[in-house]
Amino acid sequence: MKKIVLFVFLSLSLLCFGEWEYIEENNSVRLVQENTMITLADGGGGVKTPIFHYTLEEILDSKKPINTYGIEITIDENPAIKANAMVMYRVMRFPVKDVTTDEEVFNELLPQMQNGKMMKIKFLTKKYSDILIEIPLDNFNESYQQMK
């Protein structure tokens, strides 16, 4: 079954960590923190490429686009994984459609998420200071296994 990944960040609050949970109604895995929701959902419909989808609400002016030159994702002590990213205002998508290297990056990333404890995503921006988000991966694998 093909997967599509939608990561939605409503803000960068790391004060209150939640747990990843399986949502049967839409065959997805979700983490809800105080002001942050992250979802890994089944794309269905023949969708080939998984996508990380980030929405940066509070740190950026909603009327100005983010100029980025990519992202770096680090899980635990593994080397940083670099990838392209497409940005439309406050929304960042990864991998970029039809960029094979990004699809390969995702295939490397998912097993690390299943075995890791903490994922750090660094948005490399041209206009703002780089943005770092930390996402706990405790019980991610257990929840993800229910999607298969």
Q: Where would I find each of the regions flagged by the language model?
A:
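A generic "folded-domain core" signal
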Residues: 17-148
